[in-house]
Amino acid sequence: MKASIKDFEIMAPVGSRESLAAAIQAGADSIYFGIESLNMRARSANTFTINDLREIAQICDEHAIKSYLTINTIIYDEDIALMRTIVEAAKEAGISAVIAADVAVMAYCNEIGQEVHLSTQLNISNAEVLKFYARFADVVVLARELNLKQVKVIYDTIQNEQIKGPKGELVRIEMFCHGALCMAVSGKCYLSLHEMNASANRGACMQICRRAYEVKDKESDIELEVDNKYIMSPKDLKTIHFMDEMIEAGVRVFKIEGRARGPEYVRTVVECYKDAIRSYLEGTFTEEKKLGWDERLKTVFNRGFWNGYYLGQRLGEWSRNYGSEATERKVYVGKGIKYFSNIGVAEFLVEAAEMKVGDKLLITGPTTGAVFFTPDEARVDLKPVDVVRKGQHVSFKVPEKIRPSDKLYKLVSPQELKNK
């Protein structure tokens, strides 16, 4: 039977309300997020609490989006009570599934009837392990160290042996398709704990691997020459140019990494990958389109790109710089004051940096999400102007509704930012 768009999911990372709105705008099929302390981004994207579960589930239901709650850290005995409280709250709120890495979480989800998906932290690398865990889960994230030939073997085994999850349906394969990669196997790293007493496996990673390092011989004190000081900081994963191979290997849920990244990242990446799947199904997955997606993906946060291990292991794929290599950088301009719905015009107070007609702009907000546009006209005191300076109120047409206190940014090149 020919596959349809409904057979696939683009799963968006949500670490803030702005990112949730951006995921909806971009057409995400599902979102994943964490609350409290038992998730792998507890330190870097800790904006939601247990009290937000019902609202998040309701928002997702209204937009026909599945909601996945991550409870994927190591669980100690002292965590059991909190874990059960969170799982029960997720069940009561109507969260679609819990993403788990600990059998205690899986077992309790099964006990109370909460759907569970398995995290990459489990490092599932073969069909026999998948068979074991299928008693708990309907969707499995395979180890990100696998190549696509290995993924295809697991997919074929699921089909041939009819391996089913608790719902009685064939287990679906989920894989990371884009975003940050950890230098450790399936993200199980102990460097942050060793150096900073902050465990990555408890959601408190301090990103020690992203720093620059020098290599010295301890006996001679001679520094060894290395071509790159970021020797533990991998480039970001990008699979959009071989999405056809991912699909044919059996991947059905495409997970985007990035709960600590901004709403502009979420909207851009989700739109690109959603378009890639649609193009594959329509037979228009062309080199020209790949180039277009590449250019868009470069504009938002990235550390450079590589294929991961999916097409076979490659060495030397390390970041060249600290932080982002995005071709566009955000510069804060000001905040939203008012939206005139009858004419589609927004008013902003310019607080931090001047802007001019023709600048590429970005508006973000908890309900607005991420809106990109380039104004061809701007007015101050109802008069057309080319440049708007700090302290002035400016109005211009916007493509979507905005809200008071939304943030206005202009997008500039790294070189332009450096020259200021």
Regions from the PLM with identified roles:
Residues S125-L130:
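Short, glycine/polar-rich helix-capping loops at beta-to-alpha or helix-loop-helix junctions
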Residues M83-S119:
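Well-ordered mid-protein domain cores that form the structural environment of catalytic cofactors
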Residues N46-D52, A81-I86:
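Charged helix-capping and loop-helix junction motifs
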